[in-house]
Each structure stands twice: as C-alpha cells, then as structure tokens.
Amino acid sequence: MFIKTGDKVRVIAGKDKGKEGTIKKVLASQNRVIVEGVNIVKKHQKPSNSNPNGGVIDTEAAINASNVMLIDPSTNEPTRVGYKFVDGKKVRVAKKSGKTLD
C-alpha cells in the first residue's frame, strides 16, 4: 500500500472531499485507512468499565485508500506515489517533485 501510518493526506472523493488529516491506522487487507478528523460517525456505546454511562460517541470510520491522496511534504500539494530503488532499498517517491518520501 502506498500510504503509511503518520502520512499527511487529502481526501479526494466522498462527503469529506478536500479535508486533510494524518493517517491513524492502515487496514491493508481491506485496502482502507482511518484518517484523523475525517469521516466522523456516531457510535452507540454500551456501558462498560471504561465508559460507565455509555451513550453516543463520535469516532472516525475507515475510508477506502483510493479516496485519499498523499500530500508531498516539500510542496504541500497532493501527489501520486511511485517507487524507486536507492542503495538496494525500495523507497517511495513523490511523482510531482521527484523527492523521496521515506
């Protein structure tokens, strides 16, 4: 997957189009990501030891990885991601600027 935890991304499709956030979690087997502050849903919580009252809480839901685009740290613009071998290691490369991301 072209995105890693901690990357800054912009949502390019869906109800949160245009919002930016950092990747909290990558679900590679499902090709989905959880982005901080994006795709907020209401979740009904049963009372438990950690939350004795229960109730409705707001939480981030996963979105498809194809709906986000990595933001190039050097230009602060969304870019596609390519791969290149440098010193025998495979590194991610921003397609717009050509700079390595790892």
Swiss-Prot record:
Return the PROSITE patterns for the record: RIBOSOMAL_L24
Q: What GO biological process terms are annotated to this protein in UniProt?
A: translation
Write down a Pfam family by its short name. KOW
Q: Name one GO molecular function term.
A: rRNA binding
UniProt keyword annotation of Ribonucleoprotein present? yes
Q: Which UniProt keywords apply?
A: Ribonucleoprotein, Ribosomal protein, RNA-binding, rRNA-binding
InterPro entries cross-referenced by the UniProt entry: KOW, Rib_uL2_dom2, Ribosomal_uL24, Ribosomal_uL24_CS, Ribosomal_uL24_KOW, Translation_prot_SH3-like_sf
Query: Can you name a GO cellular component term?
Result: ribosome
- Does the keyword Isomerase feature in the UniProt annotation? no
Protein role: One of two assembly initiator proteins, it binds directly to the 5'-end of the 23S rRNA, where it nucleates assembly of the 50S subunit.
Its family remark reads:
Belongs to the universal ribosomal protein uL24 family.
Q: Which PANTHER family match?
A: MITOCHONDRIAL RIBOSOMAL PROTEIN L24 (PTHR12903)
What interactions and quaternary structure are annotated? Part of the 50S ribosomal subunit.
Entries under HAMAP family matching the protein: Ribosomal_uL24_B
What is the protein's name according to its record?
Answer: Large ribosomal subunit protein uL24
> Which source organism does the UniProt entry give?
Limosilactobacillus reuteri (strain DSM 20016) (Lactobacillus reuteri)
